[in-house]
Amino acid sequence: NPKQCYVVEPISHQIEILKKNVGQENVKIIQGAITDKKKIEITWDDMTESVPTFSFKEFLDEYKINNIDFLKCDCEGGEYDVFQQSNIEFLKTIPKIVTEFHLRDDENFHKCKFRWFRDNIFPQFDNIQIFSFDGVDIKWDLWNDHFIEYYNEVIVYMDNRK
């Protein structure tokens, strides 16, 4: 059991569902989005909601987090703000990381961003695996730009244990 678990969720009605389902004192549920954007609005079920935002570093500082044993990110595109160069040294101290990287959008923005991450950020981690959503190891496919066009999102597993 973790000593403390933090859940960051941007959508207010999901917060209420989380509170009902989790109900444990060691789980802190925070409404917001981890991003470098100063403000975001999310449309969900025909509603638009302004969401509080904070950078990954601001989140760590605010909650006085200096050690993470396991990080799971499903940020719907915001993962690119977490896995940026300024956070790499801290991320490398986290023993296990599982994150979803989104590659889909209207103008190939995420595919271009993923290529940059693939070429510049991922090589800084010693043990990285990349899977399609059906569980197929596609790490080597993604080094070929042609294959990236076939994926909308991928799961990335980083094992930083020494």
Where are these regions (language model features)?
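Phosphate/nucleotide-binding beta-alpha loop and adjacent structural elements of enzyme active sites
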Residues: 1-162
